[in-house]
Swiss-Prot record:
The EC number(s) this enzyme carries: 2.7.2.1
Lineage, opening ranks: Bacteria, Bacillati, Actinomycetota, Actinomycetes, Kitasatosporales
Protein name (record): Acetate kinase
Binding sites annotated in the UniProt record for substrate: 93
Cofactor: Mg(2+); Mn(2+)
Organism, as annotated: Streptomyces avermitilis (strain ATCC 31267 / DSM 46492 / JCM 5070 / NBRC 14893 / NCIMB 12804 / NRRL 8165 / MA-4680)
Compartments, as annotated in UniProt: Cytoplasm
EC class: transferase
Length: 405
């Protein structure tokens, strides 16, 4: 029998998230996380889904090689070791593929070199992704390793959406353009939303709102992305937990010239001290809503700014698409924060967008419609599953996949 298991790895700068899936039925066999790698006391949480009983280890994990060795040992205890003949491939999340990678790719030396060449446009993410890949390749050099790129789904954008209005020669020389991120999530949710509507992806136009601590919007026409809110980096677009999103670029020059801030200080400000946390000191939407309900004016203003930006993108992408069949909310805030969904859609009745308050209040892990039955445009809540998407794309490349259609 052909191997049917795929290990999905998401390697961050000081963490490794992983899931082991059986692609015969897309079931999860184990999930886990190693965090605080290289920080003295590291923590591993491993859950075999056969028992559902988690194991936690706290011990020094010096680097990603040691982390993956620990993961392999924990999987082996459950009979799910990396040396199993049932393991078909390892799928890696890679944040930035630039224009070079438009689809999942089996990793070889040339692919590694190109991911490394893209580090200047993804200095926080690609180095960690590369470390995870190289470590996994050393553990199982005989096994296919597949890179699934966050940017790939957005490579279908027309040049009119992807190009910035700056000097073409300068832009090309320094690879300055809109790449977009969260593409794995947008791809999964766009197909899942079409399924929820009972239609083929090629027949629907969607606005997908991935609202987590990081947040992005995309306009999807017939299954292909035609615009997205994040740009050269994940800083552009919506107001996020700690990122500013859109603003006048001259703010940067002002802060450097008048405020005396360095490049690194401005970078840190806009990426980690802005957005909701900069506006009200909190980046947890649950806490912000609690404060709003208690009459906190600063939290209320932060919420209003967040919603204002979100509405602007919904309206803009409605104009880009011309016809919209559904607006889909996903990720931590999008899936769980009913007040965010209600506020974002409020006042858009002329566009055919309405939220049913009772449906919107229901909490569920299942995809669902929260607009009235007779609404012209569906408003949907569709839980994302980036790990399953990576596993499906990986398995499609190395075996026979069972796609979400």
């Amino acid at each position: 029998m052909s191997p049917t298991r795929v290990l999905v790895l998401n390697s961050g700068s000081s963490s490794v998230k992983y899931q082991l899936l059986d692609m015969r039925d897309s079931s999860r066999l184990a999930v886990g996380l190693v965090e605080r790698i290289g920080e003295g006391t590291s923590r591993l949480k491993h859950t075999p889904l056969t028992t559902g009983v988690s194991r936690e280890l706290t011990s020094p994990v010096a680097d990603h090689a040691a982390a993956l060795k620990t993961v392999a040992e924990e999987l082996a205890k459950d009979g799910l070791g990396l040396d199993s003949p049932e393991l078909a491939a390892i799928g890696h999340r890679v944040v930035h593929g630039g224009r070079s990678f438009t689809e999942p790719t089996v990793i070889d030396d040339d692919v590694l070199a190109e991911i490394e060449r893209l580090i200047p446009v993804a200095p926080l993410h690609n180095p960690a992704n590369l470390t995870g890949i190289r470590t996994a390749m050393a553990l199982r050099p005989d096994l296919p390793q597949v890179a699934v790129f966050d940017t790939a789904f957005h490579t279908t954008m027309p040049e009119s959406a992807a190009r910035y209005a700056i000097d073409v020669k300068t832009a090309d020389e320094h690879r300055v353009r809109r790449y977009g991120f969260h593409g794995t999530s947008h791809a999964y949710v766009s197909r899942a939303t079409a399924k929820l509507l009972g239609r083929a992806p090629k027949d629907v136009n969607l606005i997908v709102l991935h609202l987590g601590n990081g947040a992005s919007a995309s306009a999807v026409r017939g299954g292909r992305c035609v615009d997205t809110s994040m740009g050269l980096t994940p800083l552009e677009g919506l107001v996020m937990g700690t990122r500013s999103g859109d603003m006048d670029p001259a703010v940067i020059f002002h802060l450097m010239r008048v405020g005396g801030m360095s490049t690194d200080e401005v970078d840190t400000l806009l990426n980690t001290k802005s957005g909701l946390i900069g506006l009200c000191g909190d980046n947890d939407m649950r806490e912000i809503r609690r404060r709003v309900d208690e009459g906190d004016e600063q939290a209320a203003l932060a919420f209003d700014i967040y919603i204002h930006r979100l509405k602007k993108y919904i309206g803009a992408y409605y104009a880009v698409l011309g016809r919209v069949d559904a607006v889909a909310f996903t990720a931590g805030v999008g899936e769980n924060a009913a007040p965010v969904r209600a506020a974002a859609i409020a006042g858009l009745e002329e566009l055919g967008l309405v939220v049913d308050s009772e449906r919107n209040a229901v909490r569920s892990d299942e995809p669902r419609i929260v607009s009235p039955e007779d609404a012209r445009v569906a408003v949907a809540v569709v839980p994302t599953d980036e790990e399953l998407e990576i596993a499906q794309q990986t398995y499609a490349l190395v075996g026979t996949a069972h796609h979400l259609t």
